Amino acid sequence: MYSNIDNVNILTGVLQSHGVRRVVVCPGSRNAPIVHNLNETEGITCYPVTDERSAGFVAMGIALGDPSPCPAPVAVCVTSGSALLNLYPAVCEAYYQ
């Protein structure tokens, strides 16, 4: 963890402690410190996706492609505002998988 922002380091540590090893990131100005920290953290692989509507489905595909009986969680990091709402269709789809 390399950020000088304490909350970013805490978030990265929490993700790691919950077994998150893959993160789909939609870089923006507001989440840049988080994206940078995740990208620099050993053991976490970032997958950049520019479209938030697709990012949730990409994360679901990565998780479902995991051959283990209990796939590891895949996180999605988007910027603030309506970007989060663009993940809603993928969240609904993942819930019913």
At which residue positions do the language-model features occur?
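N-terminal alpha/beta PP-like core and its mobile active-site loop of ThDP/TPP-dependent enzymes
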Residues: 1-97
